[in-house]
Swiss-Prot record:
GO terms for biological process: glycine decarboxylation via glycine cleavage system. This is Aminomethyltransferase. The glycine cleavage system catalyzes the degradation of glycine. It comes from Burkholderia mallei (strain ATCC 23344). One of its GO terms (cellular component) is glycine cleavage complex. Keywords: Aminotransferase, Transferase. SUPFAM superfamilies: Aminomethyltransferase beta-barrel domain, Folate-binding domain. GO terms for molecular function: aminomethyltransferase activity; transaminase activity. The glycine cleavage system is composed of four proteins: P, T, L and H. Belongs to the GcvT family.
Length: 372
């Protein structure tokens, strides 16, 4: 029997009677009662997620910037202000996505990366290989002594400040995709980033694992609702945010996964995977779908791996769900390049081919429905 990994908040989840599931080898909460209410809490007020299964990795050394210029597809030349964050893909030489991650710049000798839970060991092995092969001489340190809490929603930042008043000065002026280090709080030294995976404002807080339960409980006392992986998935799907292993993997180019904006080909950098991307270019479109209704009712729910018939050939849904914010069935799909926004395609659901409308992503941002 496989023993599941647990986060430092495992006992807190159990105490809240969370429904736990195996998520990539981790015992994680899928919900604490009502997934819909958790979703709506984030869209209208404030919710929090335990994302401590994700791995913080610290990179130190004089050549850390040069390392990331080579290692990732986005360009760390964009990182000039301490605390600035960059979303990027980590590619293999064939241009496939090893992982998607966030890189934080703090000094010319210290960068921090947050990688996905299921790919952490693979990522770290790849980083070590690139470091050794390139002679960069970096120290690469996974930080399992940290936990991460994501507080998300229109009122999340204010409730974090109510909980950690000493963090307000360092974080009140933070722009999206920036972080600040806040020392000496009642919850230890924190890294507070204005980032998230929900399409709402908020903070992702890197906190010592020894202090995370106290932070979690303090946030809950101030009305930040615990939320599980179920709401996290519907929120990120509405927000048009990819899930690694579902919307892209090592066999998929970022150019075919709606992630061309994370690939910087403008500078003459020899980053891993560049030659393959330039040789193959984009071979598919990555679009949103909304299942059309007949007589006010949808004939099913869009789900991953359903086939999509178009006049230009077949595609496939990569992620799908019922959207609580839109009251519609929505999906991401990889389809032939000639499929255009506004087209009607047909999705195979059980024994029927049901019509769906092609829309531009995202579906929802900051509580507002964008896809009509």
């Amino acid at each position: 029997m496989t023993v599941l990994k647990t986060t430092p908040l495992h006992a807190a989840h159990r105490a809240l009677n969370a429904r736990m599931v195996d998520f990539g080898g981790w015992d994680m909460p899928v919900n604490y009662g009502s997934q819909i209410e958790e979703h709506q809490a984030v869209r209208t007020d404030a919710g929090m997620f335990d994302v401590s299964h994700m791995c913080v990795v610290d990179f130190t050394g004089p050549r850390v910037r040069a390392f990331f210029e080579h290692a990732i597809a986005n360009n760390v030349a964009k990182l000039q202000t301490p605390g600035k964050a960059l979303y990027s893909c980590l590619l293999n030489p064939q241009g496939g996505v090893i992982d998607d991650l966030i890189v934080y710049y703090f000094t010319e000798e210290f960068f921090r990366v947050v990688v996905n839970a299921g790919t952490a060991e693979k990522d770290i092995a790849w980083f070590n290989q690139l470091n050794e092969q390139g002679g960069f001489g970096l120290t690469i340190a996974p930080r399992r002594d940290f936990a991460i809490v994501a507080a998300q929603g229109p009122n999340a930042r204010a409730k974090v400040w109510d909980t950690v008043p000493c963090a307000r000065a360092a974080t009140s002026e933070l722009k999206p995709f920036n972080a600040a280090q806040v020392a000496g709080t009642p919850f230890g030294d924190l890294t507070v980033a204005r980032t998230g995976y929900t399409g709402e404002d908020g903070f992702e807080i890197i906190v010592p694992a020894t202090h995370v339960e106290a932070l979690w409980n303090a946030l809950a006392e101030r009305g930040v609702r615990p939320c599980g992986l179920g709401a996290r998935d519907t929120l990120r799907l509405e927000a048009g945010m990819n899930l690694y292993g579902q919307d892209m993997d090592e066999s998929v180019s970022p150019l075919d996964a709606g992630l061309a904006w994370t690939v910087d080909l403008s500078a003459p950098r020899a980053f891993v995977g560049r030659d393959a991307l330039e040789a193959h270019g984009s071979r598919a479109a990555f679009v949103g779908l909304i299942l059309q209704k007949e007589n006010g009712r949808a004939g099913g729910v869009l789900r991953a791996h359903q086939k999509v018939a178009t006049p230009h050939g077949e595609g496939e849904i990569t992620s799908g769900t019922f959207s609580p914010s839109m009251q519609e069935s929505i999906a991401f799909a990889r389809v032939p390049k000639d499929v255009a926004i506004g087209d009607t395609v047909h999705v195979q659901i059980r024994d029927k081919q049901l019509p769906a409308r092609v829309v531009k992503l995202p579906f929802v941002r900051n509580g507002k429905v964008l896809a009509a």
